[in-house]
Amino acid sequence: MDLTKYQVFLKTVECGSFTAAAQQLSFTQSGVSHAISGLEEELGVTLLSRSRGGVTLTADGWALMPYIQEICRQQRSIEERAKDLQGLETGVVRVAVFTSVSVQWMPYILKSFREQYPNIEFELLPSNYNTEIARWIQDGTADCGFLVLPTEANLDCWLLQRDQWKAIVPWDHPLAGREPFPPEALTQYPFILLEEGDDYEIQEVLDTLGVQPNVQYRVQQDQVILAMVSCGLGISIMEELMLDRNEYPVVVCSFAKPFYRNIGICVKDKRAISRSTYRFVEHVRRWVLEKYSG
């Protein structure tokens, strides 16, 4: 079954323009435009609204999008199952992932996974928004994804790791090495606040501690916070996972009462995932268990 038109349509929606979609698909721009026009003619509706700024879905496009995604997902499953029957381990797994996992886990997970399954390919979809990752899994944009649990989305999830929140201070700070770290210090010293992604997680920790920090800087990346703290510009709090293999000269301190976020991996329906996705999810679970069990 030739689903090229559907695949071109989905990639165009993802990229927001014919030009960007053509580059990713190794098509000409006119080829992408022709494929979309042919699909619209075949279906008898206008799927995309064209403008100089790019393309957006029409109301009809929004209505048909889930069905087109499901058709392409089913086609991938058929192709992968056929290859399984031939004794081949191939496929593409699209993984939605947030920063700390993509930096600290994914390179090592992918390396060990591909030693077993060298012909399975990956597409990593970065986002630091739990709701966006959950939506990608639900609508088929991603085959699986890492989420902070619990999630309100109706997904099948497996808990991987409890990630503890820590305070970080410059190496020469008066509170460096102070255990437990006093929460009131967050109000007494300049605080660097991460505003990347779902910053409600940080706010929940601060609310539980009962403090309103002395926010002097608002930044978008964890690595920037580490660099600023190491230079003595302030203090902050950060997930322990992001501090793994940290090379900045900062001191990590624990609160008297530990605070955690739960990291999990999720799929839309564990009974309907592709063989490649199943193998990857199982590999991730084993890898995390082995890493933190000893």
Mark where each language-model region is.
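Flexible hinge/capping segments at coil-to-helix
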Residues: 87, 155-191
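A short LG(V/I)-centered, amphipathic sequence patch enriched
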Residues: 40-59
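Beta-alpha-beta core module
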Residues: 154-159, 163-164, 224-270
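Alpha-helical linker/hinge and terminal dimerization helices associated
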Residues: 42-43, 64-86, 284
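Short helix-boundary/capping micro-motifs
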Residues: 11-28
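Central regulatory/effector-binding core of bacterial HTH transcription factors
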Residues: 90-153, 219
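Secondary-structure junction motif
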Residues: 189-210, 273-281, 291-292
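Hydrophobic hinge/microswitch elements
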Residues: 130-133, 138-141, 148, 197-251
